[in-house]
Protein backbone atom coordinates (compact mmCIF):
# COMPACT_ATOMS: atom_id res chain seq x y z
CA UNK A 1 0.00 0.00 0.00
CA UNK A 2 2.86 2.37 0.82
CA UNK A 3 4.85 1.63 -2.30
CA UNK A 4 5.36 4.49 -4.71
CA UNK A 5 3.20 4.44 -7.82
CA UNK A 6 4.71 5.99 -10.95
CA UNK A 7 2.35 8.53 -12.49
CA UNK A 8 2.21 8.61 -16.27
CA UNK A 9 -0.31 10.98 -17.85
CA UNK A 10 -1.08 9.86 -21.40
CA UNK A 11 -2.64 12.68 -23.39
CA UNK A 12 -5.51 11.90 -25.72
CA UNK A 13 -4.60 12.61 -29.35
CA UNK A 14 -6.88 13.64 -32.19
CA UNK A 15 -6.07 10.51 -34.20
CA UNK A 16 -6.66 8.10 -31.30
CA UNK A 17 -9.08 5.29 -31.95
CA UNK A 18 -11.97 4.72 -29.56
CA UNK A 19 -10.14 1.80 -27.95
CA UNK A 20 -7.11 4.03 -27.34
CA UNK A 21 -9.25 6.74 -25.73
CA UNK A 22 -10.88 4.20 -23.41
CA UNK A 23 -7.50 2.90 -22.25
CA UNK A 24 -5.92 6.34 -21.83
CA UNK A 25 -8.82 7.90 -19.91
CA UNK A 26 -9.11 4.92 -17.54
CA UNK A 27 -5.34 4.56 -17.09
CA UNK A 28 -4.98 8.26 -16.31
CA UNK A 29 -7.72 8.08 -13.70
CA UNK A 30 -6.41 4.92 -12.02
CA UNK A 31 -2.84 6.19 -11.99
CA UNK A 32 -3.87 9.53 -10.47
CA UNK A 33 -5.97 7.85 -7.77
CA UNK A 34 -3.14 5.52 -6.78
CA UNK A 35 -0.65 8.37 -6.70
CA UNK A 36 -2.95 10.42 -4.48
CA UNK A 37 -3.38 7.46 -2.15
CA UNK A 38 0.34 7.58 -1.46
CA UNK A 39 0.71 11.37 -1.43
CA UNK A 40 -2.34 12.39 0.64
CA UNK A 41 -1.49 14.26 3.84
CA UNK A 42 -3.24 12.30 6.59
CA UNK A 43 -2.68 15.05 9.18
CA UNK A 44 -4.54 17.56 7.02
CA UNK A 45 -7.40 15.10 6.54
CA UNK A 46 -7.50 14.54 10.30
CA UNK A 47 -7.92 18.26 10.93
CA UNK A 48 -10.63 18.55 8.29
CA UNK A 49 -12.51 15.49 9.55
CA UNK A 50 -12.37 16.71 13.15
CA UNK A 51 -13.72 20.14 12.20
CA UNK A 52 -16.53 18.68 10.08
CA UNK A 53 -17.51 16.13 12.73
CA UNK A 54 -17.60 18.78 15.45
CA UNK A 55 -19.71 21.03 13.25
CA UNK A 56 -22.10 18.17 12.59
CA UNK A 57 -22.41 17.22 16.26
CA UNK A 58 -23.05 20.80 17.38
CA UNK A 59 -25.56 21.65 14.66
CA UNK A 60 -23.28 24.15 12.95
CA UNK A 61 -23.33 24.83 9.21
CA UNK A 62 -21.27 22.87 6.69
CA UNK A 63 -21.24 24.63 3.33
CA UNK A 64 -19.63 23.53 0.08
CA UNK A 65 -18.55 26.20 -2.40
CA UNK A 66 -17.60 25.65 -6.03
CA UNK A 67 -18.06 27.13 -9.49
CA UNK A 68 -18.26 25.41 -12.87
CA UNK A 69 -16.96 21.84 -12.71
CA UNK A 70 -16.20 22.24 -9.01
CA UNK A 71 -19.79 23.27 -8.43
CA UNK A 72 -20.82 19.77 -9.48
CA UNK A 73 -18.48 18.33 -6.85
CA UNK A 74 -19.95 20.70 -4.26
CA UNK A 75 -23.45 19.45 -5.08
CA UNK A 76 -22.29 15.85 -4.71
CA UNK A 77 -20.75 16.69 -1.33
CA UNK A 78 -23.97 18.27 -0.11
CA UNK A 79 -25.93 15.21 -1.26
CA UNK A 80 -23.66 12.94 0.77
CA UNK A 81 -23.39 15.07 3.91
CA UNK A 82 -27.04 16.00 4.35
CA UNK A 83 -27.88 12.30 4.64
CA UNK A 84 -25.73 12.26 7.76
CA UNK A 85 -28.26 14.54 9.43
CA UNK A 86 -26.05 17.63 9.40
CA UNK A 87 -26.83 21.13 8.13
CA UNK A 88 -25.15 20.90 4.72
CA UNK A 89 -25.54 23.15 1.69
CA UNK A 90 -23.93 23.50 -1.74
CA UNK A 91 -23.61 27.05 -3.04
CA UNK A 92 -22.57 27.64 -6.65
CA UNK A 93 -23.93 31.11 -7.44
CA UNK A 94 -21.25 33.75 -6.84
CA UNK A 95 -23.62 36.31 -5.31
CA UNK A 96 -25.22 33.76 -2.99
CA UNK A 97 -21.73 32.56 -2.06
CA UNK A 98 -20.80 36.02 -0.80
CA UNK A 99 -24.03 36.35 1.16
CA UNK A 100 -23.80 32.88 2.69
CA UNK A 101 -20.11 33.24 3.60
CA UNK A 102 -20.91 36.54 5.31
CA UNK A 103 -23.33 34.68 7.60
CA UNK A 104 -20.75 32.11 8.69
CA UNK A 105 -19.76 31.94 12.34
CA UNK A 106 -16.99 30.30 14.37
CA UNK A 107 -17.59 26.55 14.39
CA UNK A 108 -19.12 26.56 10.91
CA UNK A 109 -17.18 24.90 8.07
CA UNK A 110 -16.71 26.30 4.57
CA UNK A 111 -15.41 23.64 2.18
CA UNK A 112 -14.05 25.47 -0.87
CA UNK A 113 -13.43 23.35 -3.96
CA UNK A 114 -11.46 24.60 -6.96
CA UNK A 115 -9.54 22.89 -9.72
CA UNK A 116 -7.32 25.84 -10.59
CA UNK A 117 -7.25 27.55 -7.21
CA UNK A 118 -7.48 30.88 -9.02
CA UNK A 119 -11.20 31.60 -9.17
CA UNK A 120 -11.81 35.14 -7.94
CA UNK A 121 -15.24 34.19 -6.61
CA UNK A 122 -13.84 31.42 -4.43
CA UNK A 123 -10.91 33.53 -3.25
CA UNK A 124 -13.48 36.07 -2.07
CA UNK A 125 -15.36 33.33 -0.20
CA UNK A 126 -12.16 32.12 1.48
CA UNK A 127 -11.31 35.63 2.65
CA UNK A 128 -14.81 36.26 4.01
CA UNK A 129 -14.87 32.89 5.81
CA UNK A 130 -11.50 33.69 7.38
CA UNK A 131 -12.74 37.05 8.64
CA UNK A 132 -15.87 35.47 10.10
CA UNK A 133 -13.85 32.91 12.06
CA UNK A 134 -15.26 29.84 10.28
CA UNK A 135 -13.08 26.84 9.50
CA UNK A 136 -12.01 26.89 5.84
CA UNK A 137 -11.27 23.53 4.24
CA UNK A 138 -9.73 24.14 0.83
CA UNK A 139 -9.59 21.40 -1.80
CA UNK A 140 -7.37 22.64 -4.62
CA UNK A 141 -3.97 22.43 -6.26
CA UNK A 142 -0.99 23.28 -4.08
CA UNK A 143 0.86 26.53 -4.75
CA UNK A 144 -2.25 28.30 -6.04
CA UNK A 145 -3.57 31.53 -4.48
CA UNK A 146 -6.49 29.62 -2.94
CA UNK A 147 -4.14 27.01 -1.49
CA UNK A 148 -2.16 29.76 0.20
CA UNK A 149 -5.36 31.00 1.83
CA UNK A 150 -5.95 27.49 3.18
CA UNK A 151 -2.73 27.51 5.17
CA UNK A 152 -1.23 29.27 8.12
CA UNK A 153 -4.11 29.44 10.58
CA UNK A 154 -5.80 27.28 13.18
CA UNK A 155 -9.06 27.45 11.23
CA UNK A 156 -7.53 26.89 7.80
CA UNK A 157 -7.00 23.43 6.28
CA UNK A 158 -5.51 22.65 2.87
CA UNK A 159 -6.29 19.33 1.19
CA UNK A 160 -3.94 19.62 -1.78
CA UNK A 161 -4.90 17.78 -4.96
CA UNK A 162 -2.24 17.96 -7.67
CA UNK A 163 -2.49 16.43 -11.13
CA UNK A 164 -1.20 17.10 -14.66
CA UNK A 165 -4.03 17.73 -17.09
CA UNK A 166 -4.39 19.51 -20.41
CA UNK A 167 -7.18 22.02 -19.73
CA UNK A 168 -7.05 23.50 -23.22
CA UNK A 169 -8.04 20.31 -24.99
CA UNK A 170 -10.85 18.92 -22.85
CA UNK A 171 -12.72 19.58 -19.63
CA UNK A 172 -10.79 18.48 -16.52
CA UNK A 173 -11.65 14.85 -15.77
CA UNK A 174 -9.02 13.43 -13.45
CA UNK A 175 -9.26 16.46 -11.17
CA UNK A 176 -13.01 15.94 -10.76
CA UNK A 177 -12.50 12.28 -9.85
CA UNK A 178 -9.84 13.21 -7.29
CA UNK A 179 -12.07 15.86 -5.74
CA UNK A 180 -14.98 13.40 -5.55
CA UNK A 181 -12.69 10.89 -3.88
CA UNK A 182 -11.64 13.47 -1.29
CA UNK A 183 -15.32 14.12 -0.55
CA UNK A 184 -15.90 10.37 -0.16
CA UNK A 185 -13.02 10.12 2.32
CA UNK A 186 -14.37 13.03 4.35
CA UNK A 187 -17.94 11.70 4.31
CA UNK A 188 -16.92 8.21 5.40
CA UNK A 189 -14.68 9.41 8.22
CA UNK A 190 -17.18 11.97 9.49
CA UNK A 191 -20.00 9.39 9.47
CA UNK A 192 -17.93 7.16 11.75
CA UNK A 193 -17.53 9.99 14.26
CA UNK A 194 -21.13 11.09 14.47
CA UNK A 195 -23.47 9.82 17.23
CA UNK A 196 -24.72 6.22 17.20
CA UNK A 197 -28.29 7.12 16.28
CA UNK A 198 -27.06 7.92 12.78
CA UNK A 199 -27.16 4.30 11.60
CA UNK A 200 -30.91 3.73 12.21
CA UNK A 201 -31.62 6.98 10.36
CA UNK A 202 -29.56 5.90 7.35
CA UNK A 203 -31.33 2.54 7.34
CA UNK A 204 -34.69 4.31 7.39
CA UNK A 205 -33.62 6.51 4.47
CA UNK A 206 -32.70 3.42 2.46
CA UNK A 207 -36.00 1.78 3.37
CA UNK A 208 -38.00 4.82 2.26
CA UNK A 209 -36.01 5.11 -0.96
CA UNK A 210 -36.79 1.51 -1.86
CA UNK A 211 -40.45 2.50 -2.09
CA UNK A 212 -39.47 4.88 -4.91
CA UNK A 213 -38.19 2.02 -7.08
CA UNK A 214 -39.97 -0.64 -9.08
CA UNK A 215 -39.66 -4.10 -7.58
CA UNK A 216 -37.14 -6.43 -9.19
CA UNK A 217 -38.63 -9.01 -11.53
CA UNK A 218 -39.05 -12.48 -10.07
Locations of the language-model features?
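Internal, active-site/partner-interface "lid" segment
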Residues: 192-218
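HTH-adjacent hinge/linker in prokaryotic transcriptional regulators
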Residues: 1-43, 47
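Generic structural signal for well-ordered, non-membrane alpha-helical segments
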Residues: 15-22, 26-29, 45, 70, ...
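Glycine-rich phosphate-binding loops that contact phosphosugars or nucleotide phosphates
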Residues: 53-181, 187-194
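Short charge-dense sequence patches
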Residues: 1-5, 22-30, 72-77, 127-138, ...
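Context-gated lysine
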Residues: 17, 24, 35, 57-60, ...
Amino acid sequence: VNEGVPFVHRAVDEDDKTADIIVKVIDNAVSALLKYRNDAASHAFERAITALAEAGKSGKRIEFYGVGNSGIVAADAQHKFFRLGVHAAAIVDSHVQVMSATMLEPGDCAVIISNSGRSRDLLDVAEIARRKGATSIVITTSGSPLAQMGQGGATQVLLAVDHPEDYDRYSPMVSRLLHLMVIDILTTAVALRLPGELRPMLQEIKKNLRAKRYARPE
